[in-house]
Amino acid sequence: MESLLQTIKLMLRYIQKALILFFLFLYVVVGKVLMFLFPQTMASVLKSRFEISGVHDPKFQYEDWGPTFFTYKFLRSVLEIMWMRLEDEAFVGHSAPNTPVVDLSGELHHIWDYLQGTRPLVLSFGSCTUPPFLFRLGEFNKLVNEFNSIADFLIIYIDEAHAADEWALKNNLHIKKHRSLQDRLAAAKRLMEESPSCPVVLDTMSNLCSAKYAALPERLYILQEGKIIYKGKMGPWGYKPEEVCSVLEKKK
């Protein structure tokens, strides 16, 4: 009976993935056609999405990222993210996935190792090639400095959002897709040059953190006593340190 249930579950997962692929492919084809027929209108629509996100990195213009939408590499990267979201096990009010992470010295830990008593633990998932994540690091650092007396903070370095050999953006950091833990460590050390105000750890090469927390391309969480008390929306639109601030204000 158990093996039958596993088989059914596996079949349902394949069906889910097939449906995601179909609708995403359709979305890309339609987007590509609209970009060709109405380039100015589509540019305005895409720009408005970024304005809504509240991220205005002066280093990035539409020409750096707009033309990369609805390409094959766009399709492949978004498909990977959407398929990985099927593994999401992180829900508000439920137990936080105790996934493995690696510190910068190469030692293996788990998320719960960073929980301290009743203190909230803020998790920030991201990578250097995700412009909004890097752009808002200063804002995140302010959070750390303001609330470090009542909460702990941890940055988890995950797979590159816009690797140079994948869905790359112009005028962005040149970091290739991680093929080994050493690659990911090198990328995290690049992040350290930006002086984050809290510890940085790495997702393992199995990308279990990214999967169980549906973290790609960037995301914020707050854990407390082993449970999730805040789950931010998926970045870049949903990466909002100000929401974390509001939650922590109530904990003072």
UniProtKB/Swiss-Prot annotation:
Primary localization class, coarse: membrane
Active site: U130
Topological domain spans for side Extracellular: 1-17
Matching Pfam families: T4_deiodinase (PF00837)
Catalytic activity as recorded in UniProt: 3,3',5-triiodo-L-thyronine + iodide + A + H(+) = L-thyroxine + AH2; 3,3',5'-triiodo-L-thyronine + iodide + A + H(+) = L-thyroxine + AH2; 3,3'-diiodo-L-thyronine + iodide + A + H(+) = 3,3',5'-triiodo-L-thyronine + AH2; 3,3'-diiodo-L-thyronine + iodide + A + H(+) = 3,3',5-triiodo-L-thyronine + AH2
Record's keyword terms, sorted: Cell membrane, Endoplasmic reticulum, Membrane, Oxidoreductase, Selenocysteine, Thyroid hormones biosynthesis, Transmembrane, Transmembrane helix
Stretch forming the signal peptide: none
GO molecular function: thyroxine 5'-deiodinase activity; thyroxine 5-deiodinase activity
Any one of the GO BP annotations: thyroid hormone catabolic process
EC number from the UniProt entry: 1.21.99.3, 1.21.99.4
InterPro entries named in the record: Iodothyronine_deiodinase (IPR000643), Iodothyronine_deiodinase_AS (IPR008261), Thioredoxin-like_sf (IPR036249)
Chain segments annotated as transmembrane: 18-38
Topology of this chain in the membrane: Single-pass type III membrane protein
Positions on the Cytoplasmic side per record topology: 39-252
Stated regulation of activity: Lacks sensitivity to 6-n-propylthiouracil.
Annotated localization: Cell membrane; Endoplasmic reticulum membrane; Basolateral cell membrane
Keyword Cell division: no
A cellular component annotation (GO) from this entry: endoplasmic reticulum membrane
Summary of subunit composition and partner proteins: Predominantly monomer. Can form homodimers but homodimerization is not essential for enzyme activity.
Role, per record: Plays a crucial role in the metabolism of thyroid hormones (TH) and has specific roles in TH activation and inactivation by deiodination. Catalyzes the deiodination of L-thyroxine (T4) to 3,5,3'-triiodothyronine (T3) and 3,3',5'-triiodothyronine (rT3) to 3,3'-diiodothyronine (3,3'-T2) via outer-ring deiodination (ORD). Catalyzes the deiodiantion of T4 to rT3 and T3 to 3,3'-T2 via inner-ring deiodination (IRD). Catalyzes the deiodination of 3',5'-diiodothyronine (3',5'-T2) to 3'-monoiodothyronine (3'-T1) via ORD.
Entry similarity comment: Belongs to the iodothyronine deiodinase family.
Name this protein carries in UniProt: Type I iodothyronine deiodinase
Organism of derivation: Xenopus laevis (African clawed frog)
Name of the gene: dio1
